[in-house]
């Protein structure tokens, strides 16, 4: 009597890495779980949350793509507590722009603190600091 053998399950593709998500057009920030956390902004003036101006230095929002989230630190120079650098992944087109960060708003809270950085509320920055997920997708 022949014994039936079960076929091994087909290999599955690895899941996409978990990431934080920032949507410049709306300012929406989502946690790696997909949960909406709140809104931030990027860029200023005509470039405020305007992805069509992502190539404009010091005005447009952070360019779409993937970024590594650096270690968080407190910046006494004006960016506030719980600040991090964003390092673009190799496939991200930055249009020659650099120095992107996630930081807090200015004291006026009038959406003028960004020259391309992501400005996010403190509770979101605190959540990012505590998270093991260190990838941000700007969509």
Q: Where are the predicted features?
A:
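Exported/periplasmic cell-wall-interacting domains
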Residues: 71-139
